């Protein structure tokens, strides 16, 4: 039996913005001082906690567990109503009864990554040594750190081997890291719209966002929790800039074009005359109500540092040498954040390492965010891969 606890109150922003800590809807695994998380930066993080959601039930031989890894600003609420926003889970296109990740067949786990702000320990959590929010005293974390923490959670749940690890964007990075760090614990891996290392362009976009946050006078060098302020403007601008990279020119043209917002003529001012301006402002303002600015700094930095080949003398294929994991790599034609060329590099490395891998490039103009949207071909590919992996690993037809 897994010992879990409801999320207890952690540090909240001075303006009493809603946090997962205020809505104890997740389970939490607590790890004490005797179970530290060794971070790549050399720090042992302890105590710490991981907030997570589960859907479905673990079968008798514990062979039907799927770990879903969320993206940069995602969280553990993959298929339930979000306790803060009241919106449906972020991957309802894939997770749910009759869908590819069916809780009537699989035991689905999704945890909030270390460093985030939806219940897992991060910079907005209380530093046990000071009794105050960590802020920038929180240690730098990496994608491998996130995966090590997830592995500790999977151990706590009593699961030796995962049937599948699946994720898109930063979640895809975690998926690939799982397959490298714990190859015997991952039967299959579905890596979507991602790469094995962040490009210079993506690092540049992240630096733009971080500088926007840090330039906000309300940031207070990360100590805004204690100052009774919050860097709304900086984080909002960071989100607006990032959101553009998740879309495509065709999608923006189709959705907005040059149409005016509630007017026929320009105001000859700096108001949001165009619909696309109003849309971006909404994206920025709604984001700051659910996400912590320091967490944004930490998680973007974790993505920037990610480079699987770096630990294998720069030879990516060596990271996957003789792996027994079955892979499916998916890209989207209009994704310019993680273009198909990067997915092909992953596939080539997997092939060179002797891995079993299938690859799909999906034609769509919906940009990077296509993996979060209802794209029928994508849904069909995920379903087919899980079915074939289930047959290969003796899971087909098994109940709970």
Swiss-Prot record:
- Note one Pfam family from the annotation: Abhydrolase_1
Q: Which UniProt keywords apply?
A: Acyltransferase, Amino-acid biosynthesis, Cytoplasm, Methionine biosynthesis, Transferase
Q: Does the keyword Amino-acid biosynthesis apply?
A: yes
Q: One MF term from GO for this chain?
A: homoserine O-acetyltransferase activity
Its EC number is: 2.3.1.31
Q: What is its main location?
A: cytoplasm
A single Gene Ontology CC annotation of this entry is:
cytoplasm
Q: In which pathway does it act?
A: Amino-acid biosynthesis; L-methionine biosynthesis via de novo pathway; O-acetyl-L-homoserine from L-homoserine: step 1/1
Q: Which residues form the AB hydrolase-1 domain?
A: 64-373
Q: Which GO terms describe its biological process?
A: homoserine metabolic process; methionine biosynthetic process
The keyword Metal-binding belongs to this UniProt entry's keyword annotation = no
Q: Where is the composition biased (Basic and acidic residues)?
A: 13-23
Do you know which InterPro entries this protein is assigned to?
AB_hydrolase_1, AB_hydrolase_fold, HAT_MetX-like
- Which reactions fall under this protein's catalytic activity? L-homoserine + acetyl-CoA = O-acetyl-L-homoserine + CoA
Enzyme category, top tier:
transferase
Q: Which residues form a coiled coil?
A: none
| UniProt-listed Gene3D superfamilies | 1.10.1740.110, alpha/beta hydrolase
Provide the assembly information: Homodimer.
The free-text function statement in the UniProt record for this protein reads: Transfers an acetyl group from acetyl-CoA to L-homoserine, forming acetyl-L-homoserine.
What does the similarity note say? Belongs to the AB hydrolase superfamily. MetX family.
Q: Which protein are we looking at? A: Homoserine O-acetyltransferase
Q: Which organism is it from?
A: Rhodopseudomonas palustris (strain BisB18)
Q: Which gene specifies this protein's sequence?
A: metXA
């Amino acid at each position: 039996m897994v010992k879990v606890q409801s999320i207890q109150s952690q540090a909240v922003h001075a303006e009493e913005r809603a946090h997962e800590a205020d809505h104890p809807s997740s389970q939490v695994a607590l790890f004490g001082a005797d179970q530290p998380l060794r971070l790549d930066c050399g720090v042992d993080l302890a105590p710490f906690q991981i907030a997570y959601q589960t859907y479905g039930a673990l079968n008798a031989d514990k062979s039907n567990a799927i770990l879903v890894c969320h993206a940069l600003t995602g969280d553990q609420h993959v298929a339930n109503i979000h306790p803060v926003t009241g919106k449906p889970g972020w991957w309802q296109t894939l997770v749910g009864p009759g869908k590819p990740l069916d809780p009537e067949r699989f035991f689905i786990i999704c945890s909030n990554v270390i460093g985030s702000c939806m219940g897992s320990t991060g910079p907005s959590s209380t530093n046990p040594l000071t009794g105050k929010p960590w802020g920038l005293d929180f240690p730098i974390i990496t994608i491998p750190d996130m995966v090590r923490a997830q592995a500790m959670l999977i151990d706590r749940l009593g699961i030796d081997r995962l049937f599948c690890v699946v994720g898109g964007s930063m979640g895809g990075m975690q998926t690939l890291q799982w397959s490298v760090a714990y190859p015997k614990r991952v039967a299959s891996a579905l890596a979507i719209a991602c790469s094995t290392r962040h490009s210079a362009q993506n690092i540049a976009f992240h630096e733009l966002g971080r500088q926007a946050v840090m330039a906000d006078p309300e940031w207070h060098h990360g100590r805004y929790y204690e100052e009774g302020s919050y860097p709304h403007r900086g984080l909002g601008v960071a989100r607006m800039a990032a959101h553009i990279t998740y879309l495509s020119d065709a999608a923006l043209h189709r959705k907005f074009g040059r149409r005016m917002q509630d007017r026929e003529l320009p105001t000859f001012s700096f108001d949001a005359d165009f619909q696309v301006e109003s849309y971006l402002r909404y994206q920025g303002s709604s984001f700051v109500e659910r996400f912590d600015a320091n967490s944004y700094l930490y998680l973007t930095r974790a993505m920037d540092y990610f480079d699987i080949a770096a630990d294998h003398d720069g030879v990516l294929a060596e990271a996957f040498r003789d792996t027994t994991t079955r892979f499916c790599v998916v890209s989207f034609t209009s994704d310019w954040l993680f273009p198909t060329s990067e997915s092909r590099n992953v596939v080539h490395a997997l092939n060179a390492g002797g891995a079993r891998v299938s690859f799909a490039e999906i034609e769509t103009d919906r940009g990077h965010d296509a993996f979060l949207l209802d794209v029928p071909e994508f849904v069909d590919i995920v379903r087919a891969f899980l079915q074939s992996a289930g047959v290969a690993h003796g899971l087909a037809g098994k109940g709970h």
